[in-house]
Amino acid sequence: MVEQGVFTIVEVSTGSEYSLSDSITIEPVVVPHRAELSDMHAFIVRGPTRSLLFLPDHDRWDETLNHYHAPNIRSWLASMNVDIALVDGTFWSADELVGRTQHEVPHPPVSETLERLGCRKQNDPEIVFIHMNHTNPLHDVNSEEHSEVTALGWRVGEQGMTFTL
């Protein structure tokens, strides 16, 4: 597809901003993640009126927050000035990893993220859990876990969601 001109390979640098159009920019944000074949980045997408963090995968909140010297998730998101954060929701808990451990497949469980966040506050960004494994009970809109997320003021990603930036 690269040879056909469908994709263009562009090397990006952390902390640099890249224009996609006159009104849309992206900024790569390095996040700690098992370095199997390359480094790992989240992306901030900034539009004319709002911005979105795309963080589908990282290892552990402690590692990510320590990397940015942030005391908690809220302060880290505030430092990036994002309105919406699409965050790693791979597993609800480590119990979903049959035959493997969270050390082997590190993702912060949604249950841990909720413990760290608690209820959504007035100036918090909208947080949406994405990148869910097939074992994650958040897929079931009638599950207790799904209800817990929404009762705290956060959201569970759905196929076809759109965000106006």
Residue ranges with predicted function:
Residues S51, D59-G160:
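Cap/insert and terminal regions of metallo-dependent hydrolase folds
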Residues V6-I9, I26, A151-V156:
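Active-site regions of enzymes building and remodeling cell-envelope glycoconjugates
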Residues M1-Q4:
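Active-site HxH/HxHxD metal-binding segment of metal-dependent hydrolases
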